[in-house]
Swiss-Prot record:
Binding site residues for Zn(2+): 221, 295, 302, 305
CDD domains membership: RNAP_beta'_C
PANTHER family (alphabetical): DNA-DIRECTED RNA POLYMERASE (PTHR19376), DNA-DIRECTED RNA POLYMERASE SUBUNIT BETA (PTHR19376:SF68)
Quaternary data: In cyanobacteria the RNAP catalytic core is composed of 2 alpha, 1 beta, 1 beta', 1 gamma and 1 omega subunit. When a sigma factor is associated with the core the holoenzyme is formed, which can initiate transcription.
Protein name (database record): DNA-directed RNA polymerase subunit beta'
Source organism per UniProt: Synechococcus elongatus (strain ATCC 33912 / PCC 7942 / FACHB-805) (Anacystis nidulans R2)
Enzyme Commission number(s): 2.7.7.6
Cofactor note (record): Binds 1 Zn(2+) ion per subunit.
Entries under InterPro entries matching the protein: DNA-dir_RpoC2_beta_pp (IPR012756), DNA-dir_RpoC_beta_prime (IPR045867), RNA_pol_Rpb1_3 (IPR007066), RNA_pol_Rpb1_3_sf (IPR042102), RNA_pol_Rpb1_4 (IPR007083), RNA_pol_Rpb1_5 (IPR007081), Rpb1_funnel_sf (IPR038120)
Pfam short name (any one): RNA_pol_Rpb1_5
Domain of life: Bacteria
Lineage: Bacteria, Bacillati, Cyanobacteriota, Cyanophyceae, Synechococcales
Co-factor(s): Zn(2+)
Alphabetically ordered keywords of this record: DNA-directed RNA polymerase, Metal-binding, Nucleotidyltransferase, Transcription, Transferase, Zinc
Length: 1318
């Protein structure tokens, strides 16, 4: 090649990024790495040298704004104004207006971008900005557009497009509003990028984990299977040409030229670039090639099925870790994929629909076959929708043009219309993957003016859902009018004081609300709380006051509390603080009384005391005493210890003095006999019982006092001992023998009725009276032992609030009142209050009008139940006529005053206009009489000679199926929601794009709204029932019929009578891959009658779907990834089956096994005549597949470490260390690259001669071959995979090869050289 004789040819061409790629690729393919590096280096030097010379940089003068920008914007503004006018006239709905505005701006933006480029190209091709962007050095067209065109439409944080575009560019500068809108979108971009990197990194990690053990292990697995490769298309566009998909593949069968039957490629031949181009030129649509998906090599992929290594453009080496390369190739572009597509509110560009334009002026003819129905486009324009395929004919001057109209096309012309050249005739949807699918969306419409509602042509229909909520839906669309007027919101409970048709002046009362008292009582004006909206009036319905007792504030331990002192010298603690509320039965105060306080714990006995039965349950409060008597109290000191027995310093039954340390750190306070309770060497409690001790000789006496009993004064205890006072005699075991203990008893007397301070109560109404009652409550029951060291209160005397009604729960306020005679003295008062809230006067507030409130009572006045306390009036703000009070409706919530300025008077001769009568509604722009058009929309009020009075109104278009929020003749305030428009918004392709979609595919997730799939092939019939439900019947070849009910909102994508295949989608939406696999498997098992083949075929279908779906996501973002990478990953996801029935094999139902493992085991079973295993193929997501690998070390290092390891331990698994990850973790040489074959079993045969005479121990210490040992084995016995390249003498020089290098369309080496697109 170097010695070629011909002189080099010089070509003067522009070489941009794409050409550069090709140049380097070409050099690499023909001359290898070293020379390519030199060429690249030289190019770099050249580039830098000239970049330095040229000094290209952007200055503000380089940003040239095209002169035609102003007129472009002007025409756009004009179109938008027209749209706004149509909206104001009620010709289009809010949604259609929005769509039209967005589309107008999007088109303007595109048009402007083209002008910018054209402007540069024609007037200043050496402009720095232009050169940078178009050579691919820096920047792209959309950035240039923002610099010198317009910034365009931005999305708000919810992803909806803001219909105010940024019309300026960065050169001119943004206005404040534009700047804020602009930063919305910019921030969103940044956040997206930040989220994207994390997501993408995790995706890469999962991919690496699932495929890390795929290594090229053998040369040829010998399979005859393969995949058919065809060009990848999207509608009419070719995304990936067949030549590009074939490059670097190995053919599975011979490729023949269809026209000449010449053999283009043998079976098993790898396809290089020339061959790929020849196949494409020959017009071959499908080629069967080997693929990692069909490779039969166990646990890996063979060289032939993988094909070229794309880095070297030659067959892949043995031991190449293709799994990891695949994972990185898919994961790396992840960051470039957009996270979410902006929900553009249905802005879609021209790619989803082809516009048919008239080539010449002429007349339209729709033939006899044309089946169309009227259709309203998304911009609210009237058009026709084709219901079947037919031809549209345009007859021009001397020529006839025919256009094929497909079903579903939108036709913008009628039969017989005359059209100009370049007029748009129709919009033909593009068939193929991007079906123009729709989703339901809603939009609220709020009114711009207050007034009265009128329906015109709207037929409302009430629908009740399962929960019983009623919604009103417009069955027929029409206009919803709002007739202007001043609307007043009435306060709750207000009654109108005027009638429809009354004339009112400013300040007249329109409605009033009366505030009444429910129970009556004494009026007390609250202090003014300073609130601007209301004040409170209190009505005291009942009260009680302690008229002789005084209340004092005392401070104890730094806390202030109140004490009530009675004339009798009793002192009560006030428990409820002043200003709080207490309910019936609540304790208000408690007597301060030390008579019933003990020194220590002890035993309590009742003598004649009775307690209330019902109080027993409420032991929290204590037990209420119903009859007085005496309490008998036998003191004893109890320590609850719960410590180790070794800490005890005294013995059971020992006599101790007060102050003795009975247990470590515990001292007793009384003198007496110790009683110790212990349990399992744990000291539970110590009781010290005081009293007189007597030694007992007689065991009978001991038995008599064993339980302990009361001995009255003067009674004989035992012979020779008489009790001097009331005692409690109890026998105890002393340290030296039995003792009798006589314990002192204290007697406490309880009176029948506790003393109560005098009280004076005032009752306003007979129904309520309240008083304070004194209650004595015992804290402990008869015979209870109180374990305590300190003293306890045995009885409390409390003041409790009571009401006559007994049952009802009243709440009273506690207040302190200064005495009327002596202001220094405070008295306790309890009052029951009914609060009445009175609104303040509000100066003319927008919705209520002026309210004026007047009080009808004075402080201290007594009022009867039902008396009016205050009255609030709504006053008129502007003179006019009252309207809109609906007769017969329950409560009137709003009323309307029609003012002078809500009407306009037109001077015209009305006699000519016959169609006008009072009450008819006219849209602005309507011709009233010849030459006079209505300036405003409105309702005809009155017709007088020479005059027409219009009431201003505003029409809103309501589409069919919208949800109505208002009723006919109802009243609305400005800003109220009138209607919720339900519309269909076009989506292009899948809504989920980018990373989330890839993740959904590779994790094999069930899509949210999956489509309905046909389970068996047949002919589809579509039945529409009454309630919009659709039923699809598929009638199979043998006449069986399957029903598929379709839910609401699932658009069909098949037509009536169409033939469908098994697994074909009947409705729109992404397919659920799991269902698809199941459907295919059932179908093929029936067709082929063999499980293994059926599983392979069904898996192959799902694999193809996954590969294409992933490819299409990357393609839509303009990223090229070779199919084989995706195939390697998908192979790992689809290699397992679930066992349904183990048969006679050792497999268990529910286990996951490799398909070929099960196949081999079933073959063995067949030979021996035993039952094979039944199985179903499964599709595993990448995470699940990673956790189900054979290597537990790899799985555990990925996720759920503990679960994986415990499972492996229980099953006693061994890890064969086949993948890279396991070996890395253990620290061995990885079995790829140079380490490949170091661990192959075959090595044991060809060991180096020098090793043969060694004698080895039978039980080697280390089973794992060590790296050092592995090195000494001969590794050069394998095949030689390097290849030499020679070039024929006549091959062309580098710049001499005609069009090949510079031609854009040949995407020859795009795959080989991965240069970053950005």
């Amino acid at each position: 090649m170097a010695e070629a004789k011909s002189a080099p040819i010089f070509r003067n061409r522009v070489i941009d990024k794409k050409q550069l790629k090709k140049l380097i690729g070409w050099t690499f393919a023909h001359y290898g790495t070293a020379k390519t590096a030199v060429v690249a280096d030289d190019l770099k030097a050249l580039g830098f040298r000239y970049a330095t010379r040229a000094g290209v940089s952007i200055s503000i003068d380089d940003l040239k704004v095209p002169g035609s920008k102003a007129e472009l914007l002007e025409s756009a503004e004009k179109r938008i104004q027209e749209t706004e006018d149509r909206y104001t006239r009620g010709e289009i709905t809010e949604v259609e207006r929005f769509q039209k505005v967005i589309d107008t701006w999007a088109n303007t933006n595109d048009e402007l971008t083209d002008r910018v480029v054209k402007n540069f190209r024609e007037s200043d091709p050496l402009n720095s900005v232009y050169m940078m962007a178009f050579s691919g050095a820096r920047g792209n067209i959309s950035q240039v557009r923002q610099l010198v065109g317009m910034r365009g439409l931005m999305a708000n944080p919810q992803g909806e497009i803001i219909d105010l575009p940024i019309k300026t560019n960065f050169r001119e500068g943004l206005t404040v509003t534009e700047y804020i809108i602009s930063s919305y979108g910019a921030r969103k971009g940044l956040v997206d990028t930040a989220l994207r990197t994390a997501d993408s990194g995790y995706l890469t990690r999962r991919l690496v984990d699932v495929s890390q053990d795929v290594i090229i292990h053998e040369v040829d697995c010998g399979t005859s299977r393969g995949l058919f490769v065809e060009a990848m298309t999207d509608g009419d566009r070719i995304l990936i040409p067949i030549s590009q998909r074939l490059l670097g593949r190995v053919t599975a069968e011979a490729v023949l030229d269809p026209s000449t039957d010449e053999v283009l490629a043998e079976a098993g031949q790898d396809i290089n670039e020339d061959l790929a181009n020849r196949i494409e030129k020959a017009g071959i649509k499908k080629v069967k090639v080997r693929s990692p998906l069909t490779c039969e090599a166990a646990r890996s992929v063979c060289q032939k099925c993988y094909g070229w290594s794309l880095a070297h453009a030659q067959m892949v080496d043995m031991g190449e870790a293709v799994g990891i390369i695949a994972a990185q190739s898919i994961g790396e572009p992840g960051t470039q994929l957009t996270m979410r597509t902006f929900h553009t509110g249905g802005v879609f560009t021209g790619e989803t629909a082809r516009l048919l334009r008239a080539p010449v002026a002429g007349t339209i003819k729709l033939g006899k076959k044309a089946r169309t129905r009227p259709y309203r486009t998304r911009h609210g324009e009237e058009a026709l929708l084709a219901e079947a395929n037919f031809d549209l004919v345009l007859e021009g001057k001397g020529r006839k043009e025919t256009f094929a109209i497909l079903q579903g096309s939108t036709i913008f012309v009628q039969d017989g219309d005359k059209v100009a050249a370049e007029a748009i005739l129709a919009e033909v949807p593009v068939s193929g993957r991007t079906k123009r699918t729709v989703e339901k969306a809603t939009k609220d419409v709020a009114t711009d003016l207050a007034g009265e509602i009128r329906f015109q042509d709207i037929v409302p229909e009430e629908k009740t859902d399962r929960q019983g909520n009623t919604t009103r839906i417009a069955q027929r669309g029409g206009l919803l009018w709002v007739l202007a007027g001043d609307v007043y919101n009435l306060l709750p409970g207000a009654e109108p004081t005027v009638k429809n048709g009354d004339r009112v002046e400013v300040g007249d009362v329109l409605a009033e609300t009366k505030l009444t008292t429910e129970r009556g009582g004494t009026v007390r004006m609250g202090e003014d709380n300073g609130s601007s909206t209301h004040r409170e009036v209190e009505i005291i319905t009942a009260s009680v006051v302690l008229d002789t007792a005084t209340v004092k504030a005392e401070a104890s331990q730094g806390r202030e509390h109140y004490v009530i002192e009675t004339k009798g010298g009793q002192r009560f603690n006030l428990l409820a603080a002043p200003g709080t509320k207490v309910t019936t039965g609540h304790v208000v105060a408690e007597l301060i009384d030390s008579r019933y306080r003990t020194q220590t714990g002890g035993l309590l006995k009742y003598s004649g005391v009775e307690i209330s039965k019902k109080g027993r349950a409420k032991a929290k409060q204590g037990y209420e005493v119903t009859k007085g008597g005496t309490l008998l109290w036998i003191p004893e000191e109890t320590h609850e210890v719960n410590k180790d027995i070794s800490l005890l310093n005294v013995e059971d039954g020992q006599l101790v003095e007060a102050g003795t340390e009975v247990v470590k750190d515990i001292f007793c306070q009384t003198t007496g006999i110790v009683s110790v309770t212990q349990n399992n060497d744990i000291l539970r409690e110590i009781v010290i019982k005081p009293g007189d001790v007597h030694v007992l000789d007689d065991p009978d006496t001991a038995a008599k006092y064993d339980e302990g009993r009361l001995v009255n004064a003067g009674e004989e205890v035992f012979p020779g001992l008489t009790a001097e006072q009331l005692v409690w005699a109890e026998a105890v075991d002393g340290t030296d023998g039995p003792l009798l203990l006589l314990r002192p008893v204290q007697e406490l007397v309880i009176p029948d009725e506790p003393p109560v301070p005098s009280q004076d109560s005032s009752q306003e109404s007979s129904s309520r009276s309240i008083r304070l009652r004194a209650v004595q409550r015992l804290q402990f029951q008869d015979g209870e032992r109180i374990k305590s060291v300190e003293g306890v209160d045995l009885l409390r005397t409390q003041l409790v609030l009571e009401s006559e009604e007994g049952s009802s729960q009243l709440s009273a306020d506690i207040e302190l009142l200064p005495d009327s005679k002596d202001p220094e003295t405070l008295r306790l008062q309890l009052v029951i209050i009914e609060p009445v809230v009175i609104r303040r006067d509000v100066a003319s507030d927008t919705t209520h009008g002026s309210t004026h409130t007047e009080l009808r009572v004075k402080d201290g006045q007594k009022v009867k139940p039902g008396a009016v306390i205050a009255c609030t009036q709504i006053q008129c703000k502007e003179a006019g006529v009252v309207r809109g009070i609906q007769e017969g409706s329950e409560a009137v919530r709003r009323l309307l005053v029609e003012r002078e300025r809500d009407c306009v008077t037109l001077d015209l001769d009305v006699t000519a206009a016959t169609q006008l009568q009072p009450g008819s509604l006219i849209v602005a722009g309507t011709q009233l009489v010849d030459g006079i058009i209505a300036p405003e929309s409105g309702e005809v009020r009155a017709i007088a000679p020479g005059q027409l009075q219009l009431r201003i109104a505003r029409p809103y278009r309501v589409s069919q199926g919208a949800v109505l929020h208002v009723e006919d003749k109802g009243l609305v305030q400005r800003g109220d929601n009138l209607v919720l428009l339900v519309f269909e918004r076009a989506k292009t392709g899948d809504i989920i794009q980018g990373l989330p979609r890839i993740e959904e595919l590779l994790e094999a997730r069930k899509p949210k709204e999956a489509c309905i799939l046909a389970r068996r092939p047949g002919v589809a019939h579509i039945n529409y029932s009454d309630d919009d439900a659709i039923d699809i019947q598929v009638i199979e070849a043998d006449g069986t019929q399957a029903d598929y009910p379709v839910g609401p909102g699932q658009p069909l994508i098949i037509s009536d009578g169409e033939t469908v295949d098994a697994g074909q989608a009947l409705t729109d939406g992404p397919a659920n891959p799991h269902d698809l696999l199941e459907i295919y498997y059932d179908y093929f098992r029936e067709q082929l009658g063999e499980d293994y083949e059926a599983a392979l075929e069904s898996l192959r279908r799902v694999q193809a779907l996954l590969v294409n779906e992933v490819q299409s996501v990357y393609q839509s973002q303009g990223i090229d990834i070779s199919d084989k990478h995706i195939e390697v990953i998908v192979r790992q996801m689809t290699s397992k089956v679930r066992i349904d029935d183990g048969g006679d094999t050792i497999m268990l139902p529910g286990e996951l096994h490799e398909l070929r493992e099960v196949y081999n085991s079933n073959n063995t079973m067949a030979l021996t005549g035993m039952a094979p295993a039944q199985f179903t193929p499964v599709l595993l997501g990448i995470t699940k597949a990673s956790l189900n690998t054979n290597s537990f070390i790899s799985a555990a290092s990925f996720q759920e470490t503990t679960r994986v390891l415990t499972e492996a331990a229980i099953e006693g698994k061994s890890d064969w260390l086949r993948g890279l990850k396991e070996n890395v973790i253990i620290g061995r040489l990885i079995p790829a690259g140079t380490g490949f074959k170091a661990y192959e079993e075959s090595l044991l045969t060809d060991v180096d001669g020098g090793y043969e005479d060694r004698v080895y121990d039978d039980d080697l210490a280390d089973v794992v071959i060590d790296d050092r040992a592995a090195r000494s084995y001969t590794l050069n016995e394998g095949r030689d995979f390097s290849r030499s390249m020679t070039f024929a003498e006549g091959e062309s020089m580098i710049l001499d090869d005609g069009e090949e290098l510079i031609d854009d369309s040949s995407a020859s080496l795009r795959n080989l050289v991965d240069v970053d697109e950005d």
